[in-house]
Amino acid sequence: MSRIGNKVIVIPAGVSVEVNGATVTVKGPKGELVRSFNENITLEIAENEITVKRPNDTKEMKMLHGTTRALLANMVEGVSNGFSKALEMIGVGYRAQLQGTKLVLSVGKSHQDEVEAPENIKFVVATPTSIVVEGISKEAVGQTAAYIRSRRSPEPYKGKGIRYVGEYVRRKEGKTGK
């Protein structure tokens, strides 16, 4: 049984949280995030802490309680520190380059894949085979990184493709001849 919803969220210095009905606005040094939550979940802000409360102990409310607390904690973390996801490209001729806010991928296709950076997302290409997706929304960073990975996900025979840094790709044995 998870008790993540009962944990208090500490608001760091330089971050402000406003609650307007079911809409929460979190402002910080890196930017601003706005999100709507369920009306039944109440948020109490005291000094530099946010407490998430639920009206009753039904299964649905317990689920919403933990989810709301986790999303709110990620919003506070995002506007203060930000999130990043690193990817690496493995394969001959596989490379990435930036053209303005666009990421251009050469991954063994007859054409180049272009990925436009969504709002509040930034691409960093340190080397031609490494990509870092940075932003203030954990959800948007993860989705953008997953989209880039889907352009050429790692294949199990040679391990070529785009993968997260530290991701383990399960390898298969090739066909054996007669």
Swiss-Prot record:
User: What keywords tag this UniProt record?
Assistant: Ribonucleoprotein, Ribosomal protein, RNA-binding, rRNA-binding
Name by which UniProt lists this protein: Large ribosomal subunit protein uL6
Its lineage opens with: Bacteria, Bacillati, Bacillota, Bacilli, Lactobacillales
A Pfam entry, by short name: Ribosomal_L6
This protein's source sits in the domain of life called Bacteria
Where is it found, in Gene Ontology cellular component terms? cytosolic large ribosomal subunit
Q: How does it assemble?
A: Part of the 50S ribosomal subunit.
What is the role of the protein in this entry?
This protein binds to the 23S rRNA, and is important in its secondary structure. It is located near the subunit interface in the base of the L7/L12 stalk, and near the tRNA binding site of the peptidyltransferase center.
GO function terms (MF aspect): rRNA binding; structural constituent of ribosome
A Gene Ontology biological process noted in the UniProt record is: cytoplasmic translation
Q: Which family, according to the similarity comment?
A: Belongs to the universal ribosomal protein uL6 family.
Species of the source: Lactococcus lactis subsp. cremoris (strain MG1363)
